[in-house]
Amino acid sequence: MQTLSSAPDPAVSIAVTILALLLALTGFGLWTAFGPKAAKLTDPWDDHDD
């Protein structure tokens, strides 16, 4: 049984690191898409005339 003072399993540390990275990237993507600077984004399909 692990106690709080013992070192965590390396697999758990790697899993938590990957999860934190994915959450950070998802948050950044949502902030970019819907945040204050989203008004400056343009749709390339609308800009292209056929």
Swiss-Prot record:
InterPro entries (alphabetical): PSII_PsbN
Cellular component, GO annotation: plasma membrane-derived thylakoid membrane
Annotated membrane topology: Single-pass membrane protein
Domain of life: Bacteria
GO BP terms in the entry: photosynthesis
Protein localization: Cellular thylakoid membrane
Segments passing through the bilayer: 14-34
UniProt entry keywords in alphabetical sequence: Membrane, Thylakoid, Transmembrane, Transmembrane helix
Family of the protein in this entry: Belongs to the PsbN family.
Function in brief: May play a role in photosystem I and II biogenesis.
Name of the protein in question: Protein PsbN
